[in-house]
């Protein structure tokens, strides 16, 4: 086979991979939407607040949210079913980006990654058979996500809190001598992810990288599926495994092929958003969920203490998540978010403050609601600290 024939074969393979990728991506988004549907349209009796990125943005009417969400679903069906989905993918990206602006909680890690991949598909001219650039941009994004996901987990909270909590159902069945090895074995999780991210970008170690990535997703599913935890990430893990198999096939190229060749390119955007910007999260300059920090133990955590009067006024779905406390009840914001939206709370001070304000509207006195935010230490300066605010203090801080 001469060089021209080889290039044509590579282009044809890339186009087939791009078509398969768009179908998997659209199905993954549809599954994510279905499992977190209350996040995407207004439901009667919802207490958890919508938090726009900009305060000047108006509240979206419930009827508009249904139409907006329906349009996104229709566009995904068209992306999956049409041979040339560029216009539908571009429309989806535009509508989805605008929709996220009206509620920070919608910027979930899985949605952020899917949105970039849809942008890559929208940027590709489907009349051109060479789809290698969008595929390489998506591949670079996937590798960076593994790398930073592992890096974010290199903190004490992950080993002492996250791992024991997730593994508890299995550890309870093991002898105490083996259960003590949890922290040691937990160290393999971030190392596996970091190695997977690096190996996927090399020809020599790619097979090992693919294997490590697949093992990671199988392990996550074993921790979550049998115990019905956070089911919105189930399709994300299945889709991520599929992305690895599609994007890192034998002819995917070496590390140089994944790096940008032009300043203005999809690969440059992938490198900036997923390769460089996550480093800023360790300085508090970039979002944790935009830096693959889900289940890392490296995000600020918020809890509320509410009085009996406030507890009695909560929706039943939220009331079931209350835990007894010395003064009233405690409510973890993640439990609240799962109860109403089926997604974890977006970790930002603005979201925490707005959630506290929603509870304060049910209070009779400022002390009926207290917000407690525990901020972990940063890698580069900044120690762990706890901030506690009641309803009066929240009014001053806003």
How does the language model describe each region?
Residues 2-398:
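Alpha-helical membrane-anchoring segments
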């Amino acid at each position: 086979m001469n060089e021209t024939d080889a290039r044509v074969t590579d282009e044809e393979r890339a186009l087939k991979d791009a078509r398969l990728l768009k179908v998997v991506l659209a199905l993954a988004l549809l599954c994510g939407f279905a499992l977190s549907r209350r996040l995407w349209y207004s439901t009667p009796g919802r207490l958890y607040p919508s938090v726009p990125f900009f305060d000047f943005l108006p509240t979206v009417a419930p009827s508009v949210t249904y139409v907006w969400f329906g349009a996104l679903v229709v566009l995904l069906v068209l992306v999956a079913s049409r041979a040339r989905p560029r216009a539908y993918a571009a429309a989806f990206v535009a509508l989805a980006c605008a929709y996220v602006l009206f509620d920070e909680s919608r910027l979930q890690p899985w949605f952020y990654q899917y949105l970039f991949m849809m942008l890559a598909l929208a940027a590709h001219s489907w009349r051109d058979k060479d789809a290698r650039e969008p595929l390489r941009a998506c591949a670079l994004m996937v590798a960076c996500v593994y790398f930073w996901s592992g890096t974010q987990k290199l903190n004490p909270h992950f080993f002492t809190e996250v791992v024991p909590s997730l593994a508890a159902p299995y550890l309870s069945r093991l002898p105490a001598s083996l259960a003590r090895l949890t922290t040691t074995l937990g160290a393999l999780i971030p190392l596996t992810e970091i190695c997977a991210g690096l190996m996927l970008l090399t020809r020599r170690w790619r097979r090992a990288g693919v294997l490590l990535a697949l093992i990671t997703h199988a392990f996550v599913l074993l921790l979550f599926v049998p115990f019905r935890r956070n089911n919105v990430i189930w399709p994300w893990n299945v889709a991520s495994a599929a992305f690895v198999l599609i994007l890192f096939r034998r002819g995917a190229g070496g590390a140089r092929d994944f790096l940008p060749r032009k300043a203005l390119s999809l690969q440059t955007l992938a490198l900036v958003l997923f390769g460089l910007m996550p480093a800023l999260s360790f300085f508090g300059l970039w979002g944790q969920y935009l830096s693959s920090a889900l289940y890392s133990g490296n995000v600020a955590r918020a809890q509320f203490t509410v009085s009996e009067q406030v507890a009695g006024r909560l929706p039943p779905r939220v009331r079931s998540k209350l835990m007894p406390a010395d003064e009233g009840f405690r409510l973890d914001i993640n439990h609240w978010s799962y109860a109403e939206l089926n997604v974890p709370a977006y970790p930002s001070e603005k979201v925490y403050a707005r959630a506290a304000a929603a509870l304060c509207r049910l209070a009779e006195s400022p002390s009926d609601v207290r917000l407690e935010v525990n901020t972990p230490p940063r890698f580069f300066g900044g120690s762990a600290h706890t901030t506690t605010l009641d309803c009066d203090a929240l009014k001053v801080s806003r």
